[in-house]
UniProtKB/Swiss-Prot annotation:
Entry protein name: Uncharacterized protein I2
């Protein structure tokens, strides 16, 4: 299963793999507790964001962003998720493949 995650551009200072694994970890934890990824909070480089849904994407929207549509302040991460043998709710924990460096335009996201 492939999924795209919209993240603040400031988070791009982390290596793609490291950022992806960390997002998987916190999303998996949230899913195991309440069976949804929305509401997850994350902070990297002093930029706090909350996970919400936008179209068919998970969007880590900055807490001070009042926009309802992501703009060029965000980047898009594409990843493949593989189901965990432990629990379907934790399937995000096993995803070694990431491709990023895409900016998020209004048309794309």
């Amino acid at each position: 299963m492939s999924i795209k995650i919209i993240v603040p551009r400031e988070w791009k200072s982390f290596p793609d793999l490291q950022l992806g694994w960390e997002l998987h970890r916190i999303i998996s934890l949230r899913q195991s507790q309440v069976q949804t990824a929305t509401g997850v909070e994350a902070s990297f480089n002093g930029v706090m964001a909350v996970c919400t849904e936008y179209s068919f994407y998970l969007w880590f929207r900055k807490t001070d962003d009042t926009n309802i549509i992501p703009d060029s302040k965000y980047s898009l991460i594409s990843t493949q998720f593989f189901e965990s043998p432990v629990s379907p709710l934790e399937n995000i924990a096993y995803s070694p493949k990431y491709s990023t460096n895409e900016s998020c335009s209004d048309k794309e996201c």
